[in-house]
From Swiss-Prot:
HAMAP family assigned to the protein according to its UniProt record, in alphabetical order: CH10 (MF_00580)
Compartments it resides in: Cytoplasm
SUPFAM superfamilies per record: GroES-like
Quaternary context: Heptamer of 7 subunits arranged in a ring. Interacts with the chaperonin GroEL.
Organism annotation: Methylovorus sp. (strain SS1 / DSM 11726)
GO BP terms: chaperone cofactor-dependent protein refolding
Protein name, per record: Co-chaperonin GroES
Domain of life of the organism encoding this protein: Bacteria
Length: 105
């Protein structure tokens, strides 16, 4: 069973935040906040305007996105916590630059 969002809805899987600091201190689950970044795993067909035309979504499956702390609705599917939100609740798409993708020697 999978989820298929409707209209301008987007399903996002949160990307887990790092649980240790640079100095090696482990941050417990109770002290850490939910991450505000995730990967789009499903999208709707787009927003329907009053005249009946459909506007396609800007985001696509696989995009890494940023969203507000209180954005969307949390749902559980197969024991996995997902976030369903409107495209307008997405603050931006994280784009990987070539510099980050290159292996540092």
């Amino acid at each position: 069973m999978s989820i298929r969002p409707l209209y301008d809805k987007v399903v996002v899987k949160r990307i887990e935040a790092q649980r240790t600091t640079a100095s090696g201190i482990v941050i417990p689950d109770t002290a850490s906040e939910k991450p505000e970044q995730g990967e789009v795993i499903a999208t709707g067909n787009g927003r329907r305007l009053q005249d009946g035309t459909q506007v396609p979504l800007e985001v696509k499956v696989g995009d890494q996105v940023l969203f507000g702390k209180y954005a969307g609705q949390t749902v559980k599917l197969h024991g996995e916590e997902l976030l369903v939100l409107r495209e307008e609740d997405i603050l931006g798409v994280v784009e990987a630059s070539d510099a980050k993708l290159k292996k540092v020697a």
